[in-house]
């Protein structure tokens, strides 16, 4: 029986076991997906000796995605471009890895807001932390002419923009309001609006009527930003879909079956969020 896990610190709140457990049951596969907390001071040694840990592969979450990437014998193009890996597997005892965050983000948009990238001109990304890398990469892959990157610390946005090239334009937080006027899609990658954090307060009235607003946060499922966007009549994309879609390639790699992100899976995770009081802000 294949055994895989989610590796990070902490991982107690990870819903990945629920996601993969759903697919294992759905397809009648004898497999196990567990949580494995790896202390930061043990991470480098853990991934360096991954073949000895008893796992066929797994997912990596914060704060270990970069450490895991550095331990890889081979990495897929997305992982190489971003310098982080979130999906691992073994081939002949060698550790291989991929980054499925960017494809997961795009798949979520494709399913939830079809045609969102039909005429890709300007996208606005809020935040220059770890989550923003996959989002920036995704927008560039879909051919956006310009991706505005806003961060409270401008130097951080500038450093990230330098990594991705001239189509990514760093702006200060005070430039967000003006940028909303030209953005076709807005993606929040900050923790603002997350449970226990202050809301992301933006004036969405200046957005075009066909604009799409996305959030990588899924606790709460409907962030204040998404709630405001819905009230404005805009199409919205929550962060739960990204979590579900990014999980597909790993499951296919480990178990040989490409699973579907269906209503039953989403309902399962939403029910878990509801049980923990995490649906609303």
UniProtKB/Swiss-Prot annotation:
Keywords: Amino-acid biosynthesis, Aromatic amino acid biosynthesis, NADP, Oxidoreductase. One of its GO terms (cellular component) is cytosol. Pathway: Metabolic intermediate biosynthesis; chorismate biosynthesis; chorismate from D-erythrose 4-phosphate and phosphoenolpyruvate: step 4/7. SUPFAM superfamilies: Aminoacid dehydrogenase-like, N-terminal domain, NAD(P)-binding Rossmann-fold domains. InterPro entries: Aminoacid_DH-like_N_sf, NAD(P)-bd_dom_sf, SDH_C, Shikimate_DH, Shikimate_DH-bd_N, Shikimate_DH_fam, Shikm_DH/Glu-tRNA_Rdtase. Its EC number is 1.1.1.25. Shikimate binds at residues 14-16, 61, 86, 101, 218. NADP(+) binds at residues 127-131, 151-156, 216, 239. Pfam families: SDH_C, Shikimate_DH, Shikimate_dh_N. The active site is at 65 (proton acceptor). The keyword NADP applies. The keyword ATP-binding does not apply. Belongs to the shikimate dehydrogenase family. Involved in the biosynthesis of the chorismate, which leads to the biosynthesis of aromatic amino acids. Catalyzes the reversible NADPH linked reduction of 3-dehydroshikimate (DHSA) to yield shikimate (SA). Homodimer. This is Shikimate dehydrogenase (NADP(+)). The gene is aroE.
């Amino acid at each position: 029986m294949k055994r895989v896990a989610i590796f990070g610190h902490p991982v107690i709140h990870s819903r990945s076991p629920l996601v993969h457990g759903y697919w294992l049951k759905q397809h009648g596969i004898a497999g196990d997906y567990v949580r494995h907390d790896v202390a930061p001071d043990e991470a480098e040694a853990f991934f360096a000796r991954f073949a000895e840990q008893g796992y066929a592969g797994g997912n990596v979450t914060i704060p270990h995605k970069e450490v895991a990437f550095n331990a890889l014998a081979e990495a897929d193009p997305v992982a190489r471009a971003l310098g982080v890996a979130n999906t691992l597997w073994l081939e002949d005892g060698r550790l291989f890895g991929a980054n499925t965050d960017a494809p997961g983000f795009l798949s979520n948009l494709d399913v939830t807001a079809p045609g969102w990238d039909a005429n890709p001109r300007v996208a606005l990304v809020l935040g220059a932390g770890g989550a923003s890398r996959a989002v920036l990469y995704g927008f560039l892959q879909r051919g956006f002419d310009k991706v505005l990157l806003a961060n409270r610390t401008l130097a951080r946005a500038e450093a990230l923009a330098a990594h991705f090239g001239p189509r990514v334009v760093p702006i200060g937080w005070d430039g967000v309001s003006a940028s909303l006027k030209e953005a076709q899609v807005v993606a929040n990658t900050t923790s603002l609006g997350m449970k226990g954090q202050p809301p992301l307060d933006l004036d969405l009235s200046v957005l075009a009527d066909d604009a799409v607003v996305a959030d990588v946060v899924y606790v709460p499922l409907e962030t204040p930003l998404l709630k405001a966007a819905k009230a404005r009549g805009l199409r919205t994309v929550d962060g739960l879909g990204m979590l579900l879609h990014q999980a597909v390639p790993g499951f296919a790699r480990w178990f040989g079956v490409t699973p579907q992100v269906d209503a039953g899976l989403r309902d399962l995770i939403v029910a878990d969020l509801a049980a923990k009081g995490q649906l609303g802000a």
